[in-house]
Each structure stands twice: as C-alpha cells, then as structure tokens.
Amino acid sequence: MTLDSYDKLLGTVLQEYKILSEYKRLQNEDLGGLYVIPSFENSFLWFGVIFVRSGPYKDGVFRFTVSLPDKFPNDATVPTVVFQSETFHPLIDPYNGTLELAEAFPKWKSGENHVWQLLKFIQYIFASFDEYMSLAEQSANNVAYELYGQNRPEFLRKVEECVRLGQSRLYDPAPVQDRNYIVFDRFDRETHGPVLESLKQGKANEVTTPPSSGLSWVKEGVFQPLSKQG
C-alpha cells in the first residue's frame, strides 16, 4: 500500500467515525416522534420518518431522506433533506420535495452544526408550525405560504390532504433495496401483542424481543409507533 493510499484510507475511516458519532449524538436529544437511520449501503444517506404530534400536521407521517455532502462534516455545504411524498408545507418544494434550509443553516459550520440540529428543525416546522410561520422570511412553496396568510381554511384543507396521503402510504413496500430502510408492518397480535401488553403495564424494559426482522409496527388507524391504548 502506498503512502497516498494509506492516507486516503485513514481519511475515509476518520470520516466514517465522525458520521457514526453524529448518529450516536441523537441518543442524547429529544427527538420524540422522529426516527432516522443511516443507509446500510451508504452512510452518507440517512432514512427518516416523522410522526407529527401537534399543530395543523398532527397525525401526519412523513418520510424523508438526509443526504450528507461528500466532505461532511468538513464542508460548508448543508446536508440535503428531501421528503418522499407530496407534503404541502411552505418550506418544502412542491416539485422535488426538498426542504428549504438556507434560513436556518446559511452554511454548515464543522464543530458547531450537527445533524441533530437539522432534525430538531424538522420537528419544529411541523410541531410548532404557527410559531415558525410568525418568524419565517423564506418559502419554497409560495402557494402554501400565501394560502396560510390569506386563506387559512383552504390551507388547512390542503394540509389535511397531505396528512391523509402520508398515512395511506405508511405500509408501502420499500422503494429501495436497503436493509436499513424503515419499514412499518401492520399490527399482528401474535408478534406484537406481548410488546403492546407490556407497554400498557409499564413493563416494556422486561420484554425479551425476538431477533429483529427490520420491521417496525404501527397499529392501524393509530399513527404512533408502539401506541398505547387508553
């Protein structure tokens, strides 16, 4: 192995370590309702899904991807977030699903900016939507932005449509062949029943789970993972 090859390999290993560290940081953040995991095939691509718990988008389930730039984190280029289904939101491009991040992250600052901050921003623009709109100065969807200010009932109608669309696609087959793609399975009493009962009894930590199949489950009609019944 030449010196140049060794340096290149070392640089790749260090970069992978930094990406892994970014993912590990998520464990210390309050990202309730938002789930991400790096692709098995490509650590620069992360799969995500957010279950919105409040605001106009409540009960919405929206899939997205996070793409890290080639030189991450030592690059001023901001990661790219793309929503996978039509999401009617002032910050989401209606044609390609790209989330507008320029206002929140004008450029990426290594050591100062982290992926968890980007994910927190995604949480914020859905769960605290009205607060966000009171501060927003940029838009990727002018129709959504103008309707919010000029015709609130029509805006909410379109939001409800995209919420229903996201719910209807929750169980769609994975569009890519990747072991880490987040897939949801319909509730199965034999497989998921013991976990649900333990959750209801406050004994989730005592459950012995079988080997992972790569699937998560959501009770049909209740759009929260591992939902408890009242």
UniProtKB/Swiss-Prot annotation:
Disulfide bonds: none
InterPro entries noted in UniProt: Ub_conjugating_enzyme, UBQ-conjugat_E2_core, UBQ-conjugating_enzyme/RWD
Residue ranges constituting the UBC core domain according to the UniProt record: 14-168
Gene3D superfamilies with a match to the protein in the record: Ubiquitin Conjugating Enzyme
Record-stated family: Belongs to the ubiquitin-conjugating enzyme family. FTS subfamily.
Protein's name according to its UniProt entry: Protein crossbronx homolog
Organism of derivation: Aedes aegypti
